[in-house]
């Protein structure tokens, strides 16, 4: 027993010495709580609500501090000034992608979300160009969303104003919009393969908010133990299989002179570069890039919509004002369009406040510095993970008085006109900002206004008893389950 104690002490000393060297040997990292051997600062964090822990630590250590996730240090940026300086003013230096084991195992450094360096730059540049040419952010995609919104309305009418859980239908719409861009076709909502794909997205989003996945990202060795990560990887395998089948169909019918969609454009690029020794345009990168676009374009929008309906149920006075504006500007005989937004300041403010309040991805994905840098008087070595707290910006009480309160007035001036805010960054900011931001904001506006144009939202309980608090608040904020009635107007 004495020998085991001595070995334990020696191991602890070795670990602490290693941590000290990482902190002081090559640079001077910001201060932070003292890490414990092996587990780092894990015991000082509330894995069910990381944001709460970061807020408390910021009060003690300031707007920039260091945390150890296991034995690996990460620098946390807390507050608008630090986040903007890093992501915008010095975007290139902070443009690396930090380690995220649960997805790194899947993507293997490919795609447009979890890649870094030239691979990321080239894949992102190509993807953005193709997506824009296919109508992303333009009238073409707006019309596609309007068509899908009408399909949603038809599906909601079939509920006959009976209580229903909106989750599945809210996933269908953004997923089908992505399908139309990537594969040039949509699916019926009762298509079995499509329903299974939606199930995978829904389950995985909920799993990402759980403490177990936070632990997995700190200790990837957990991969070899039983746990919810196994279901997550099983679901991803199903998603990849679905994507691969669609790509193979495209290969069989490809006409290089008439590309139909994103897959065709990528396959043509692959053919052009097949003789290059290190081309980024490979089948693996195509599959991963499609998976990235699907995940980013489906999960975030659908769950924001789910939170949105819950908030509108809780605040019927706000919902009534939005419907009044819809009636005045749009009426009931045409579909809402993006041009309407400039004439609907209150509705626009509500859309922004929903995204601010929901805070769907509280800490953004981890960044990494691409070189040794000096930042705020500290020396941060190349490769160090950077965690920007988006919550600290979206809930800044100087910019948004009473930030814990859902209040569209946060985005309205004294005259009732829409008021922009530089602090509005639910999609992160800078070079690593979400590539689908424009699409997501378009979907949110068009879908919610279309729903409220056709239905009155009826809660099953007193609005005062509705609790919009996330059921999980880890890497993502997971909305609670609920039912409501869509009563035709």
From Swiss-Prot:
Q: What's a single GO CC term here?
A: endoplasmic reticulum membrane
Q: Which SUPFAM superfamilies match?
A: Cytochrome P450
Q: Which reactions appear under catalytic activity for this entry?
A: an organic molecule + reduced [NADPH--hemoprotein reductase] + O2 = an alcohol + oxidized [NADPH--hemoprotein reductase] + H2O + H(+)
Q: Name one GO molecular function term.
A: heme binding
What does the sequence similarity comment in the record state about its family?
A: Belongs to the cytochrome P450 family.
Which purpose does this protein serve, as stated in its record?
A: Cytochromes P450 are a group of heme-thiolate monooxygenases. In liver microsomes, this enzyme is involved in an NADPH-dependent electron transport pathway. It oxidizes a variety of structurally unrelated compounds, including steroids, fatty acids, and xenobiotics.
Protein name per UniProt: Cytochrome P450 2C3
Q: Which organism does this sequence originate in?
A: Oryctolagus cuniculus
